[in-house]
Amino acid sequence: MPMTLGYWDIRGLAHAIRLLLEYTDTSYEDKKYTMGDAPDYDRSQWLSEKFKLGLDFPNLPYLIDGSHKITQSNAILRYLARKHNLCGETEEERIRVDILENQAMDTRIQLAMVCYSPDFEKKKPEYLEGLPEKMKLYSEFLGKQPWFAGNKVTYVDFLVYDVLDQHRIFEPKCLDAFPNLKDFMGRFEGLKKISDYMKSSRFLSKPIFAKMAFWNPK
């Protein structure tokens, strides 16, 4: 029986999950909820189901796999990763995975706070000023390894790919000074299942955020 992934009809927090589902060749339904337009941003399509799905903490995204009903995007990623041994194999690798999962979410939230802010035009230059230092830390952490935990793909590569790609859309030159990050992005996009997915009609790269965001390329 296929899994069900529920989320808004945007990229948002589901992008890394969708990528991981595709990479692992998992059968799933990508259930997309539509939000209304301004000024109300009607959410009734989701709210009408929110408390009927048996979720402990009803929220989007959610993943339903038989009796397993999971919310929180990183909990979903970890669940899928455990099924496919993509959590790191050594203690050192798992430590790197744990660190990077949290670091990537911090970076994601920092960008989102700028993009959802009514003061976006004021905050954007400030954010761009600090961006090279952020990218430098990711570059140094990756080093000469092909993947962020080491020699094998783990679920945080999906998370970091998404976060770096969002920043690449936000500021197209932000990775230019970091060849290893650019190589990582190309290596990830070159994975057969990922490449096939990105060429398919199922692939959703934009919009990144919900409709109330002040920066949200279509």
From Swiss-Prot:
CDD domains: GST_C_Mu, GST_N_Mu. GO terms for cellular component: cytosol; mitochondrion. Residues 90-208 form the GST C-terminal domain. Residues 2-88 form the GST N-terminal domain. Substrate binds at residue 116. Its main location: cytoplasm. One of its GO terms (molecular function) is identical protein binding. InterPro entries: Glutathione-S-Trfase_C-like, Glutathione-S-Trfase_C_sf, Glutathione_S-Trfase, Glutathione_S-Trfase_N, GST_C, GST_mu, GST_superfamily, Thioredoxin-like_sf. It catalyses: RX + glutathione = an S-substituted glutathione + a halide anion + H(+); 11(S)-hydroxy-14(S),15(S)-epoxy-(5Z,8Z,12E)-eicosatrienoate + glutathione = (11S,15S)-dihydroxy-14(R)-S-glutathionyl-(5Z,8Z,12E)-eicosatrienoate. The modification Phosphoserine is found at residues 27, 44, 117. Pfam families: GST_C, GST_N. Coiled coil: none annotated. Belongs to the GST superfamily. Mu family. Conjugation of reduced glutathione to a wide number of exogenous and endogenous hydrophobic electrophiles. Participates in the formation of novel hepoxilin regioisomers. This is Glutathione S-transferase Mu 2. It comes from Mus musculus. The gene is Gstm2.
